[in-house]
């Protein structure tokens, strides 16, 4: 008697240490990949990261202060980033309807299209990889990534506070 095929392939045994090592490999590959993507777009990594946040915000346009907070740079530094992104045709600045002293940052549609064209083949491969996982496994992955991001951000903030206290 043969058993029915499994709907999803069995997973190799892993330990937290092995998972952390795999995560470190992914982070390193992602960092190198991000540098290469930025070069192809004639941007530096920080500018590309800011542009990604602008894209992610969609119609809920961000302020310069929002970007500075997300990328953990000063508002002065983010002004330079926005100047470069605007000169390169990636963003435009719009007056804030609630506060005339502030501006909101909008992505230029043709620049979004260029970025998507570059990233789309990679994301298609990731989508294909997700097809190997059950909905429950994907839910676990999404939960883990979300919680790990929260931990990473909290630890980075803790390090900043320690540094400020030491000064």
Predicted regions and their residues:
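Canonical helix-turn-helix DNA-binding module
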Residues: 61-103
């Amino acid at each position: 008697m043969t058993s029915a095929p499994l709907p999803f392939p069995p997973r190799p045994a892993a330990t937290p240490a092995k998972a952390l090592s795999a995560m470190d490999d992914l982070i390193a590959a992602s960092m190198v990949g991000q540098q290469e993507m930025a070069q192809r777009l004639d941007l530096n990594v920080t500018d590309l990261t800011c542009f990604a946040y602008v894209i992610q915000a969609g119609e809920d346009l961000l302020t310069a202060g929002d970007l500075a907070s997300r990328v953990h740079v000063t508002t002065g530094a983010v002004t330079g980033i926005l100047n470069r992104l605007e000169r390169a045709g990636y963003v435009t600045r719009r007056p804030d309807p609630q506060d005339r002293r502030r501006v909101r940052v909008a992505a230029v549609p043709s620049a979004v299209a260029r970025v998507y064209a570059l990233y789309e083949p990679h994301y298609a491969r990731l989508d294909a990889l997700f097809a190997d996982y059950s909905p429950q496994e994907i839910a676990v992955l999404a939960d883990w990534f979300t919680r790990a991001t929260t931990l990473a951000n909290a630890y980075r903030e803790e390090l900043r506070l320690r540094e400020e206290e030491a000064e």
